[in-house]
Regions:
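Juxtamembrane "helix exit" motif at the C-terminal ends of alpha-helical transmembrane segments
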Residues: 68-85
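Pan-zinc metallopeptidase signature
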Residues: 80-164
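Residues at structural and domain junctions
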Residues: 8, 25-29, 70
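Context-gated lysine
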Residues: 7, 47, 58, 144-145, ...
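Active-site recognition of the HExxH zinc-binding catalytic motif
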Residues: 13-29
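Post-HExxH zinc-binding segment in Zn-dependent metallohydrolases
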Residues: 30-71
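Active-site scaffold of zinc-dependent metalloenzymes
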Residues: 1-11
Length: 164
């Protein structure tokens, strides 16, 4: 239909939007996740969407972030002495997002060091598994690979590709 024929719709191109939604479809087996928008946003060309997209997984997160940032100078200009307190909400959102990014970065590094291509494996993990993988050593990951059919399948399907 017309969706595919328009180059851009509300700032998004059709191919990017469809790829984004396909990633959501791939993760439907998992319960609500703190990474609901992280994986779909990784396909976007815009760095901002790749980096900040996960903030939009829940409606209240961008409201807390942007609302707090917008309200603070207004309250300061109005002479309210507690204007700085309103910045606590944006700081909490930023700190939580930083923590989530650090966990997924650690999990990706651990998987890469153990010989896995990290993004396809992480896409197929629940939050609990991602958090656990972020804390595992190479030896612990090797033990999982040796004892778990699921991890063996990860190793078979998603090894790090070596250049020839």
């Amino acid at each position: 239909g017309s969706f595919m024929h328009r180059k851009r719709r509300m700032g998004y191109d059709a191919a990017e939007t469809l790829a984004h939604e396909l990633v959501h479809a791939a993760r439907t087996a998992f319960p609500d996740s703190v990474y609901d928008e992280f994986f779909p946003c990784q396909i976007h060309q815009a760095k901002f969407r790749r980096y900040a997209g996960n903030i939009f997984r829940k409606w209240y997160l961008p409201m807390m972030l942007l609302g707090g940032i917008a309200a603070a100078p207004v309250l300061a200009a109005a002479g309210c002495s507690f204007w700085g307190v309103i910045l606590i909400a944006p700081l909490i959102v930023i700190a939580r997002e930083f923590q989530l990014r650090q966990r997924i970065r650690n999990a990706a590094d651990n998987l890469r060091n153990a010989g896995f291509d990290p993004m396809p494996v992480l896409l197929r993990m629940s939050d609990r598994e991602i958090f656990e993988t972020a804390t595992l050593t190479r030896e612990q990951l090797a033990a999982k690979k040796a004892s778990s059919p699921r991890w063996q399948q990860f190793a078979d399907c998603f090894p790090i590709k070596t250049e020839l």
